[in-house]
Amino acid sequence: MSFSRSEAAPAAPLPDLAATLAAPRDDAFQQLGAAFVTRLPAAPLPAPYVVGFSDDAARMLGLEPALRDAPGFAELFCGNPTRDWPQASLPYASVYSGHQFGVWAGQLGDGRALTIGELAHDGRRYELQLKGAGRTPYSRMGDGRAVLRSSIREFLCSEAMHHLGIPTTRALAVIGSDQPVVREEIETSAVVTRVAQSFVRFGHFEHFFANDRPEQLRALADHVIERFYPACRDADDPYLALLAEATRRTAELVAQWQAVGFCHGVMNTDNMSILGLTIDYGPFGFIDAFDAKHVCNHSDTQGRYAYRMQPRIAHWNCFCLAQALLPLIGLHRDAPSEDARAERAVEDAHAVLGRFPEQFGPALERAMRAKLGLALEREGDAALANQLLEIMDASHADFTLTFRHLARVSKHDARGDAPVRDLFIDRDAFDRWANLYRARLSEEARDDASRAAAMNRVNPKYVLRNHLAETAIRRAKEKDFSEVERLAAVLRRPFDEQLEHDAYAALPPDWASTLEVSCSS
């Protein structure tokens, strides 16, 4: 398989795209006003070059993949031309606040991200945002830059999560530069173009609530409802309905994270999408040797965002969103007094938040049932899945390979057990569980082959393990971007065998255990 690009690729209409982005802005979020955004050009990035590009994300935007080869592509998607755009067309950074590691952090905002415009395709509108585009009024002590290392990780994981079927922001491109930036060591700059229908976060609502700006809070909620939750308009209480939908999406999202062993790493409220998307890929990680207490973020010394904590933290974050929406809940109903409205709003919000476990639990159970190849629903299925996770935890069995190899287990006998059994230190514990599993499989009408095929459609063979990303990053630092492309291509087909790429599905090498990721990016 070749990952080189044809020199005969047709020229893409880059001037048309640049003109579209530079045209006077009509995207809805920036029209909310100066209380929400600050316009400014991107900081110049010297001698930019393309590190990675997603053909799939380009097609989603209605762009031709050949666009990446057009002269000026790297310049456009690091933001350099924005210095010449008219004031009405300038990119913008948005302001928000939030709780970080459970503590109110006050005003935050897009400290290094600029939204450069919207593109519409197939009835949807997408915002394009440049992460690493320079300082903004919300940069605090930061330099506004992103580094090559973290940009490649975000690019790869955004696309990997999409192809796993998990709601996520997307990534169109990574643009690099030799410009040095200081982190824990000297690194080089990069800009990742991320794409989403909206980058509105829980923290946007928290900001206007905390600053006692009810008009802006309502305008923001109305924008989100009108654009993304139109069904909420017809509810008895549109703002309560918004909270309910955002909470449901969040619960279902985290269930999907748990089902693939994904750890976000920094589940601050300013990193929570109002649309229920995975957003802000920083010190994330897919679990290798399973540990329910696994913490992927080296900076998270208290383990607040450990794998097992993610559902609880997501629920807590929804409480923060609910608090921010309280001034709006009940405004459409008659109430004898403001105190009565506020009291009823608290009751209604608590009722919505109380449904989170009822939404998360069944969503995770459905996912785990599918991962075990169980088409029928039985009362003991959740216990069977939990027992598997417990023995995986005790043996530190590889998360991804355990579920992938389970497809080889036969309902009739133990002859197919070896590949998954060998992942366990305590093989007697696995044998005991496997006997329970086989007994449960005997209740299913599907034969082994049909069940295995169904399991392989939900249990990925390939995930973005840290050592795979690290290998691509090390080569990219030497100006060899072929591994970024190769790895991205493999991750676009996570459920396929791709036998020529078996090495990407192997157990991590010993050196992978020394890798640490943190908030430094």
Curated annotation (Swiss-Prot):
Classification via Pfam families: SelO (PF02696)
Annotated EC: 2.7.7.-, 2.7.7.108
Residue positions binding Mg(2+): 271, 280
Superkingdom of the organism of origin: Bacteria
Residues holding ATP: 109, 111-112, 131, 143-144, 194, 201, 280
Cofactor(s) required for function per UniProt: Mg(2+); Mn(2+)
Active site: 270
Signal peptide (from-to): none
Keywords: ATP-binding, Magnesium, Manganese, Metal-binding, Nucleotide-binding, Nucleotidyltransferase, Transferase
Catalysed reaction, written as an equation: L-seryl-[protein] + ATP = 3-O-(5'-adenylyl)-L-seryl-[protein] + diphosphate; L-threonyl-[protein] + ATP = 3-O-(5'-adenylyl)-L-threonyl-[protein] + diphosphate; L-tyrosyl-[protein] + ATP = O-(5'-adenylyl)-L-tyrosyl-[protein] + diphosphate; L-histidyl-[protein] + UTP = N(tele)-(5'-uridylyl)-L-histidyl-[protein] + diphosphate
GO MF annotations in UniProt: AMPylase activity; ATP binding; magnesium ion binding
Family indicated by similarity: Belongs to the SELO family.
Function: Nucleotidyltransferase involved in the post-translational modification of proteins. It can catalyze the addition of adenosine monophosphate (AMP) or uridine monophosphate (UMP) to a protein, resulting in modifications known as AMPylation and UMPylation.
The name this protein goes by in its record: Protein nucleotidyltransferase YdiU
The organism of origin for this protein: Burkholderia pseudomallei (strain 1106a)
Gene: ydiU
